[in-house]
Amino acid sequence: MAGGCGRRRVVVCAVALGLSAAVLALTAVVLLRAYVLRSPAIPRLWARRGSTAAFSASERRELKEALRGAVRIPTVSLSSEDFNTTAMAEFGDYIRKAFPAVFSSKFIQHEIIGEYSHLFTVQGSDSEMMPYMLLAHMDVVPAPPEGWDFPPFSAAEHEGFIYGRGTLDNKNSAIGILQALEFLLRRNYRPRRSFYVGIGHDEEVFGQKGALKIAALLESRGVKLSFLLDEGSAILDGIIAGVKKPVALIAVTEKGLMTLNFTVEKEPGHSSFPPKETSIGILATAVSRLEQNPMRSLFGRGPELMTMEHLASEFNFPLNLIMSNLWLFSPIVSRVLAWKPSTNALIRTTTAVTMFNAGIKFNVIPPSARATVNFRIHSGEKAKEVLETVRNTVADDRVKIDVIEALDPLPISPWDDQTFGVHVFQRTILDTFPNVDSVVPGTCIGNTDSRHFTNVTNAIYRFNPVLLKSDDLPRIHGLNERISVESYEKQVEFLFQLIKNCDVDKLPEPHANSHEL
């Protein structure tokens, strides 16, 4: 008996020691990864220089007024067949007057594409260097004046801000690119590396007549791009919980899109003797099932994992330990991210019921009911998979489901120490924005014109070099869209320096202070 107890104690001690060793080993791994990830996943190849373009006072006034003039032109697009063609043509005339050096340069070719879009080919002095492209769009979403502090197309300047539709999406980029090029030309600067500038006129309605045709033209000419930079993410200040410093988030992919119509048809009748289920009730049940059963979390199957790991060193304890060890803590992080709509959108395909139409009179059983649901598809799945999940969730043959439009997510662009574009962005951001220490990859929630260019490059990046705070986000497509004059000056400075930085023909050796980023 005593011998048996002794053996049990030995076994218990051995198990306890084994568990202790496992816990210690796990703790060591967690701490080691937290230590290793203090340095960036991509080493800094450039020393921070701290200064870039020096614009004169008159140039700063000029760039501000050039943007204001463009914002005053109501280049609204409502649908692929309904947009303000008069304003689109006026925008073309406007940029010719605003940027005379660009339009008179002997090494810049300008073409009108799809009647209103613009393609500029800037011929560099070294034809051996692979070209790149800067992309933007002139069109804007509608802006009814109700609720605005200033008329949406007045470009009013108030307390250091320019108010107006397009100040953030996306005339700031369209005008900023041309402004930077104008300033470079005045300084007799000719780029070594060729590049293209594309300005679409129908991005807000999927770019079928603008960017799509520009991309097709480049492909027909055999053009291959080193990278393409379009609108998308930005420099986020105070938006990422737990991170105090501004973070430059560059989207390496964008979510897909699918819009479905749901229809239920039943015999109409009088409300005094209703059937057990009406068309409205059946459809309401189907829609409720979709809302109560969100798409599965795909955390870790898209760029969101890279985003967290690249930001790990910016978080305070204990978040830095958690973000450095997502191999262990990802289930917890995924659940936390699901709490808020803004972060939930990063980890799954989202479901949004946007339209519901039914009923003709208070005492009539309606013959039909219709709903529209919009899905933004995570990069870890395809539209076909989402449709199958929707059908299985609704599980009712009485509900007819029609696909209105479907776009798969774009491939994830390279983000590593061999990618030229990534290092050029890093260098330009760090020099232009001294308060930014982190340049990280991410996901663009919306859709951009860049999706049309996958046949000419696999390196597509989405970044609007402006500083955004939490209260700026609802202004995009919303009321009182605005940009600070200082932020726009920085955007032009970024683009000015980006063009110059792209003229290096190879990457330098890693900088000794790579741990700084």
UniProtKB/Swiss-Prot annotation:
Presence of keyword Hydrolase: yes
Domain of life the protein comes from: Eukaryota
Residues binding Zn(2+) 2: 137, 169, 230
Needed co-factor(s): Zn(2+)
Subcellular location: Secreted
Manner of cofactor binding, per the entry note: Binds 2 Zn(2+) ions per subunit.
Main location: secreted
SUPFAM superfamilies: Bacterial exopeptidase dimerisation domain, Zn-dependent exopeptidases
Active site residues per record: 139, 203
One Gene Ontology term from the biological process aspect of the record: proteolysis
Activity regulation comment: Lipoproteins are powerful coactivators of PM20D1 activity in vitro and NAA biosynthesis in vivo.
Record's keyword terms, sorted: Glycoprotein, Hydrolase, Lipid metabolism, Lyase, Metal-binding, Protease, Secreted, Signal, Zinc
Cleavable signal peptide: 1-34
Pathway note: Amino-acid metabolism; Energy metabolism; electron transfer; Lipid metabolism; fatty acid metabolism
Catalytic activity as recorded in UniProt: an N-acyl-L-amino acid + H2O = an L-alpha-amino acid + a carboxylate; an N-acyl-aromatic L-alpha-amino acid + H2O = an aromatic L-alpha-amino acid + a carboxylate; N-(5Z,8Z,11Z,14Z)-eicosatetraenoyl-glycine + H2O = (5Z,8Z,11Z,14Z)-eicosatetraenoate + glycine; N-hexadecanoyl-L-phenylalanine + H2O = hexadecanoate + L-phenylalanine
Glycosylation sites: 84, 261, 455
Assigned EC number: 3.5.1.114, 3.5.1.14
Annotated Zn(2+) 1 binding sites: 169, 204, 477
GO annotation, cellular component aspect: extracellular space
GO molecular function: aminoacylase activity; hydrolase activity, acting on carbon-nitrogen (but not peptide) bonds, in linear amides; lyase activity; metal ion binding; peptidase activity
InterPro entries according to UniProt: Bact_exopeptidase_dim_dom (IPR036264), Pept_M20A (IPR047177), Peptidase_M20 (IPR002933), Peptidase_M20_dimer (IPR011650)
Cited function: Secreted enzyme that regulates the endogenous N-fatty acyl amino acid (NAAs) tissue and circulating levels by functioning as a bidirectional NAA synthase/hydrolase. It condenses free fatty acids and free amino acids to generate NAAs and bidirectionally catalyzes the reverse hydrolysis reaction. Some of these NAAs stimulate oxidative metabolism via mitochondrial uncoupling, increasing energy expenditure in a UPC1-independent manner. Thereby, this secreted protein may indirectly regulate whole body energy expenditure.
UniProt-listed PANTHER family: N-FATTY-ACYL-AMINO ACID SYNTHASE/HYDROLASE PM20D1, N-FATTY-ACYL-AMINO ACID SYNTHASE_HYDROLASE PM20D1
Family per record: Belongs to the peptidase M20A family.
Protein name: N-fatty-acyl-amino acid synthase/hydrolase PM20D1
Organism: Gallus gallus (Chicken)
Lineage per the UniProt record: Eukaryota, Metazoa, Chordata, Craniata, Vertebrata
